[in-house]
Design a protein with these regions (language model features):
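A generic structural signal for alpha->beta connector loops
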Residues: 9, 58-60, 84-86, 149, ...
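Conserved Class I SAM-dependent methyltransferase catalytic core
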Residues: 17, 132-189
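SAM/dcSAM-binding transferase cores
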Residues: 186-232
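Mobile active-site "lid"/loop adjacent to the S-adenosyl-L-methionine
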Residues: 110-137
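Residue-level signal for inorganic ion chemistry
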Residues: 28, 109, 138, 196
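General small-molecule cofactor/ligand-binding pocket signal
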Residues: 13, 88-90, 176-179
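Conserved SAM/SAH cofactor-binding pocket of Class I
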Residues: 27-101, 105-108, 114-120
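SAM-dependent Rossmann-like transferase core, predominantly class I methyltransferases
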Residues: 2-37, 43-50, 54-55, 192, ...
Length: 232
């Protein structure tokens, strides 16, 4: 598919989006906790929102995104999917957006450049630069709009994890799941899947997982996680 990806139940076009479909988004969409009302913060192409809509068949899934082109394309992607009646995308900065009601779950693949260095592609730089969506703003929004029993799940680069988790703790959230993700057992951890709760969790889960098997294919863990999405 030119300028896009075909998954088992939907397709993603991305020619007007600064941030393209990647492993991070697929991981989060397949791993995150859900609920009846789900919000994707920085929804981009709509990939994660659509994965959540596929996994949680009764959920209303909304996305909020600052880039107008991405919002337009995510709406078109959603409109071609089987979940069109349960997906809504809003064009607004998170800091200024007021949803209609609280959410049971939030997901985010947040900007991760922690300095002001801008890439040549301004749209891509904005999508990836934490100056445009500081971690503090994500958690202050979640304090207002995440249900008391809700969960906030994210995927962040390993080097950004401490800053992200520190902000969560400062704003009263509890870490309930942490997966250290590496490509193979011989490679360093490159990204972290994290889940925070408003209430202190009864159990805490932490593990290290690999994306690739020794033969170069998907690992058993990654294959099981994404089997409902990737076309074989």
């Amino acid at each position: 598919m030119l300028n896009g990806f075909i998954f088992k139940e939907f397709a993603i076009l991305q020619d007007r989006c600064a941030m393209k479909v990647g492993t991070d988004g697929v991981l989060l969409g397949a791993w995150a906790r859900g609920g009846k009302r789900i919000l994707d913060i920085g929804s981009g192409t709509g990939l994660i929102a659509m994965m959540m809509a596929q996994r949680f068949r009764d959920a209303i899934v909304e996305g909020v995104e600052i880039d107008a082109d991405a919002v337009g394309q995510s709406r078109e992607n959603a409109g071609r999917s089987p979940f069109a009646d349960r997906l809504r995308f809003h064009h607004a900065p998170l800091q200024a957006w007021e949803p209609e009601a609280p959410f049971d779950a939030m997901v985010t693949n947040p900007p991760f450049f922690l300095n002001s260095l801008q890439a040549p592609d301004k749209a891509r730089a904005r999508a990836r630069n934490a100056e445009f969506l500081p971690f503090a703003n994500i958690f202050s929004f979640a304090r207002r709009w995440l249900a008391e029993t809700g969960h906030l799940s994210a995927v962040v680069p390993a080097e950004a994890y401490e800053a992200f988790a520190t902000e969560a703790f400062l704003q009263g959230f509890f870490l309930e799941r942490l997966y250290h993700v590496r490509s193979t057992s011989r490679k360093p951890v490159r990204r972290c899947l994290v889940s925070f709760a408003r209430l202190r969790p009864e159990m805490y889960e932490e593990k290290t997982v690999e994306l690739m098997a020794p033969d170069g294919g998907r690992s058993a863990w990654y294959d099981a996680l994404t089997e409902d999405f990737y076309v074989k």
